[in-house]
C-alpha cells in the first residue's frame, strides 16, 4: 500500500472505489480495461476480488457470466506475468462462484452458461493457470450444481419457491379468516361438555339429596313441595344423562320411566295426605301439583281415582293450575256424575301424563343449555300454572300487577266455592279445554295410538304408553334441537286452558282488560268494560294467532333469539285493532315486577287482615272493584299523560318543521339575492368595459375627424394664401406702376399681420396634432403590450412543448442506441 500513498488524495481515489465504478458499466468491450486495472493494482487484489464477488451476488443472472469472464481475464493476465496472488481467493471461493452463474429457472441459459464455464476451466487447465486438483474440484462442483439446486428446497427452482411461499401466505390468511367454523359446531360446545360432565358426576349426590328432601316432606307443606320438585328435576336429569350417554339418538328406557313414575307417585301421595288436612297453607306453593299428578298413571283404576280426587282437593287450594292438575280435577267431578266417563278420563290422564313425561325426557344437554341461555333474556315470573319454572314470555313490565291479581284470585277461593263454580260450569266445555292440551301433546302419536286412548282396559293403556314412548323416540330426530319451541308451545297451551277457565266462569266479574296482559305499553292499555264483548275476545284472538304460528311453522324461539321484541301477525281481527306487540326488556321488567310484587304483597296482607270476618266472595268483589277503580284512574291518567306528550311532540315537530322551512326559504332567498347581485355586478362590469371601448372608439373617430379637418383647413389655407399672394403680386405690380409709397407701406403692414395670424394658427394646429399623435401612440403601445404578453405566453408554451418533444426524442434515441448496442454485443458474443 506504500505505492499508493503518494497518489491517493481522497476516498474516491482508492482502487476499490474506482473498480466499483468500472463494474457498474461493465461490458464485453470493457473487460480488458477492467482486468488491466486489476493488474495495475495487484497489491490490493484481494479487495478488488471482494468487490467483484459482492457485485456478482447482487447482479442478475445475465450479468454474472460477464463477471466470470472478467475473473478469467484477470487469472490469465496474472499467470502471464507469473504472479500467483489470484489463486488463493479463487480457490477459497470457487464453491460460491460457479453456482452463482447457473440459473435454476431457465434450462437453456443454464445449459449455455455451463458450456461457457466448462470451456473456461479447460482453458485454465491448458494454460496451466490452476493445477489439476483445482480443475477436478471445479468440474465436480459444476456437475454437482447440475444435479442439485443451491436453494433451500433441493427439488424446486427459485420461482417455484416464490410461488410456494405465496401459497403458504394465502393459506395462512385463509386460516386466520376461518378461525371459528360455525357450520359443523355450536358456539357453546365447550361449556356444554363441562355442564354435562358436572351433571354426570353429581347425579348420585343429587339423587341422595332428593331422597332426603322427600323424607322431610311430611313435616310441612312447603318443604314437601320443594323436595318433590327437586326430586323430579334430579330424576329427570338422571334420565337425561343416562339416555344421552347410552344412545346418541336419545332413546329412553321404559323401565327407568316406570321407576321414576313410581317414585313420583309415592311423593304425590305423601303430599296429598298433608295437603288435604291443610288446604290453606298449601296455597303458597307454586308449580308442584302439576308435576306430581303426572306420576299417578301406572296404578289401578281405583287407586288412580282416589289419587285424582286427592289431587283435585290439593290443586284447588294451591296456586298452580296446569293442564295436568286441571285434568285430575275434572276427573274427580265427572266420577260424581258418571263412572263410565271417569274411566275414559283416567285413560286420557294416563296418556297425557306419559306424554308430558316423554316431553320432559326429550330434553338433552344442548336443549338445556339453549334454555339456560334464553332464560336470562326474559322475566322470571312466579306463575302457578307452569310445570317448567323460570320462563315466561308473556309477563313483563306493567303485567306484574295483572299476574298478582290472578294469583290472589285463585288463592282467595276455598274448595267449596271452587266446586260450586265447577258444578255450574258445563262439563263439555271443560273437556274441550283439556282436550286441546291432550291433542297437542299427542300430536306426534299415530292414529292407532289416538284410538287406543279411548279404551277402558289398563292393559291397553300400558300398551298405549309403550306405543307413545316408541313414537316419541322415533320423532326425536325430527324435533331435535327444538326444546325451546316445545316449552313455549307448552306454555301457550297452558295459558290458553287457564284463561278459558277464568273467562268462561268469571266474565261478569273480570275487572281487568285481557289486552293489558298481552300489551306491555301503557298507551295501548285500555280499561275493561264488562258490557262489551270485544275485550273478552282479545285473549282468544291472541291464542288464535299463536295457533296460526304453530300451524305455519313459525318458531317463536327464532323470533325471540333475533330480537328482544317481536310482533305476531293480526290474522283474526276481531276488534279490527292493531297487532299485539310484546316488548321484552329484561332489566326494566324485573325491576317493575319486583316493585309490584312487593307492593301487592303488602296490599294482600292488609286485605286478609281487614276482611277475616267477611266471606271470600264479598272480599273478592270489593277488592276487585277497588282495584278496578284504581286501575281505571291510573289508566286514565296514563292515557292523558301519553296524549299530552304526544301533543307536545306533535307541536314540537310542527315547530321544527316550520323553522326548517323558514330557514330553507331564507337560505333560498339569500342564495337568489347573492346570485342576482353577482349577476348584476357582472353585467355592470361588462357594461363598463363596453362603454370604455365605445368611448375609445369614439375618441379615435373624433381624433381622426379632427385630423382630417385640420388637413383640409391647412390645404384651404394654403390655397387662400396662394391666391392672396398672387393678388398681392398684382397689387404690388400696380403699386410699383403707380409709384405710390403709401400703398406700398400699407400693403406690407397688412402682409405682416396676415403672416403673424397664420403662424399662430399653424402653431395651434401643430400642438393639437402632436397631442393626437401622442394619444394614438399610447393606444398603440397598449395594444402592442397586450399582444406581446399574449405572444410571449404562447411562445413559452410552444417552447415547453418543443422541449418536451426534444426530451422524448432524445430518450427514444438513447433507447434505440442502447438496443443497438445490446444487439451488437449479442452479435459479437455469437461470433
Swiss-Prot record:
Region spans: Disordered: 205-233, 265-354, 434-480, 572-831
PROSITE patterns: CID
Biased amino acid composition, Low complexity: 272-354, 434-477, 817-831
Skewed-composition ranges (Basic and acidic residues): 592-601, 611-813
InterPro entries: CID_dom, ENTH_VHS, Nuc_rcpt_coact/corep
Occurrences of domain CID (ranges): 1-146
Matches recorded under SMART domains: RPR (SM00582)
PANTHER family in the record: NEOSIN, ISOFORM A, NUCLEAR RECEPTOR COACTIVATOR 5-RELATED
Protein name: Putative uncharacterized protein DDB_G0281733
Amino acid at each position: 500500500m506504500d505505492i499508493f500513498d503518494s497518489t491517493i488524495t481522497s476516498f474516491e481515489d482508492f482502487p476499490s472505489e474506482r473498480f466499483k465504478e468500472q463494474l457498474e458499466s461493465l461490458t464485453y468491450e470493457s473487460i480488458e480495461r477492467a482486468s488491466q486495472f486489476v493488474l495495475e493494482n495487484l497489491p490490493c487484489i484481494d479487495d478488488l476480488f471482494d468487490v467483484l464477488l459482492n457485485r456478482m451476488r447482487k447482479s442478475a443472472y445475465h450479468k454474472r457470466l460477464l463477471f466470470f469472464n472478467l475473473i478469467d481475464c484477470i487469472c490469465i493476465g496474472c499467470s502471464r506475468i507469473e504472479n500467483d496472488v489470484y489463486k488463493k481467493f479463487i480457490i477459497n471461493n470457487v464453491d460460491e462462484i460457479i453456482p452463482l452463474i447457473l440459473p435454476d429457472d431457465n434450462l437453456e441459459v443454464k445449459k449455455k452458461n455451463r458450456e461457457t464455464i466448462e470451456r473456461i476451466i479447460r482453458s485454465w487447465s491448458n494454460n496451466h493457470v490452476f493445477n489439476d486438483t483445482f480443475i477436478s474440484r471445479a468440474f465436480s462442483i459444476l456437475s454437482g450444481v447440475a444435479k442439485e439446486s443451491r436453494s433451500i428446497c433441493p427439488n424446486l427452482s427459485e420461482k417455484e419457491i416464490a410461488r410456494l411461499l405465496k401459497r403458504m401466505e394465502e393459506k395462512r390468511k385463509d386460516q386466520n379468516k376461518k378461525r371459528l367454523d360455525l357450520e359443523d359446531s355450536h358456539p357453546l360446545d365447550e361449556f356444554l361438555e363441562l355442564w354435562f360432565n358436572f351433571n354426570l358426576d353429581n347425579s348420585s349426590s343429587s339423587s341422595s339429596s332428593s331422597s332426603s328432601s322427600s323424607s322431610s316432606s311430611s313435616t310441612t307443606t312447603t318443604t314437601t313441595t320443594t323436595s318433590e320438585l327437586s326430586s323430579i328435576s334430579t330424576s329427570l336429569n338422571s334420565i337425561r344423562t343416562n339416555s344421552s350417554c347410552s344412545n346418541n339418538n336419545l332413546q329412553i328406557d321404559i323401565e327407568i320411566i316406570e321407576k321414576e313414575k313410581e317414585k313420583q307417585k309415592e311423593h304425590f301421595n305423601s303430599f296429598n295426605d298433608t295437603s288435604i288436612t291443610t288446604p290453606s297453607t298449601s296455597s303458597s306453593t307454586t308449580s308442584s301439583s302439576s308435576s306430581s299428578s303426572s306420576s299417578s298413571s301406572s296404578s289401578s283404576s281405583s287407586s288412580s281415582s282416589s289419587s285424582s280426587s286427592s289431587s283435585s282437593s290439593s290443586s284447588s287450594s294451591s296456586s298452580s293450575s296446569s293442564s295436568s292438575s286441571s285434568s285430575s280435577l275434572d276427573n274427580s267431578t265427572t266420577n260424581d256424575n258418571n263412572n263410565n266417563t271417569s274411566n275414559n278420563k283416567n285413560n286420557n290422564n294416563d296418556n297425557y301424563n306419559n306424554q308430558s313425561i316423554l316431553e320432559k325426557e326429550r330434553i338433552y344437554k344442548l336443549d338445556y343449555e339453549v334454555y339456560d341461555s334464553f332464560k336470562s333474556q326474559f322475566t322470571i315470573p312466579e306463575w302457578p300454572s307452569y310445570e317448567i319454572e323460570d320462563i315466561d314470555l308473556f309477563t313483563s313490565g306493567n303485567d306484574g300487577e295483572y299476574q298478582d291479581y290472578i294469583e290472589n284470585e285463585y288463592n282467595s277461593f276455598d274448595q267449596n266455592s271452587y266446586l260450586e263454580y265447577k258444578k255450574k260450569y258445563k262439563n263439555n266445555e271443560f273437556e274441550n279445554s283439556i282436550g286441546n292440551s291432550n291433542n297437542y301433546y299427542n300430536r306426534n302419536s299415530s292414529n292407532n295410538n289416538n284410538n287406543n286412548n279411548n279404551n277402558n282396559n289398563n292393559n291397553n293403556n300400558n300398551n298405549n304408553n309403550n306405543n307413545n314412548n316408541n313414537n316419541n323416540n322415533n320423532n326425536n330426530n325430527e324435533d331435535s334441537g327444538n326444546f325451546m319451541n316445545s316449552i313455549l308451545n307448552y306454555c301457550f297451551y297452558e295459558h290458553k286452558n287457564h284463561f278459558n277457565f277464568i273467562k268462561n266462569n268469571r266474565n261478569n266479574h273480570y275487572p281487568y282488560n285481557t289486552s293489558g296482559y298481552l300489551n306491555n305499553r301503557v298507551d295501548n292499555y285500555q280499561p275493561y268494560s264488562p258490557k262489551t264483548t270485544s275485550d273478552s275476545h282479545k285473549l282468544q284472538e291472541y291464542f288464535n294467532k299463536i295457533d296460526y304460528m304453530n300451524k305455519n311453522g313459525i318458531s317463536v324461539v327464532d323470533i325471540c333469539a333475533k330480537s328482544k321484541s317481536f310482533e305476531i301477525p293480526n290474522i283474526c281481527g276481531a276488534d279490527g285493532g292493531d297487532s299485539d306487540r310484546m316488548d321484552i326488556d329484561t332489566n326494566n321488567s324485573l325491576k317493575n315486577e319486583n316493585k309490584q310484587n312487593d307492593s301487592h304483597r303488602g296490599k294482600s296482607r292488609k286485605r286478609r287482615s281487614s276482611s277475616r270476618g267477611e266471606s271470600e266472595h264479598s272480599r273478592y268483589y270489593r277488592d276487585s272493584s277497588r282495584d278496578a277503580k284504581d286501575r281505571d284512574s291510573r289508566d286514565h291518567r296514563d292515557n292523558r299523560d301519553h296524549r299530552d306528550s304526544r301533543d307536545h311532540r306533535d307541536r314540537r315537530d310542527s315547530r321544527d318543521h316550520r323553522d326548517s322551512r323558514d330557514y330553507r326559504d331564507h337560505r333560498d332567498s339569500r342564495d337568489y339575492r347573492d346570485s342576482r347581485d353577482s349577476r348584476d355586478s357582472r353585467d355592470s362590469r361588462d357594461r363598463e368595459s363596453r362603454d370604455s371601448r365605445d368611448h375609445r372608439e369614439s375618441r379615435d373617430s373624433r381624433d381622426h375627424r379632427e385630423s382630417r379637418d385640420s388637413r383640409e383647413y391647412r390645404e384651404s389655407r394654403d390655397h387662400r394664401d396662394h391666391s392672396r399672394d398672387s393678388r398681392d403680386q398684382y397689387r404690388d405690380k400696380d403699386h410699383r406702376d403707380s409709384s405710390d409709397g403709401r400703398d406700398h407701406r400699407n400693403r406690407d403692414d397688412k402682409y405682416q399681420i396676415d403672416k403673424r395670424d397664420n403662424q399662430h394658427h399653424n402653431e395651434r394646429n401643430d400642438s393639437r396634432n402632436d397631442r393626437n399623435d401622442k394619444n394614438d401612440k399610447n393606444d398603440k403601445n397598449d395594444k402592442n403590450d397586450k399582444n406581446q404578453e399574449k405572444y410571449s405566453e404562447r411562445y413559452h408554451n410552444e417552447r415547453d412543448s418543443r422541449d418536451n418533444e426534444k426530451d422524448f426524442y432524445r430518450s427514444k434515441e438513447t433507447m434505440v442506441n442502447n438496443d443497438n448496442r445490446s444487439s451488437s454485443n449479442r452479435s459479437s458474443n455469437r461470433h
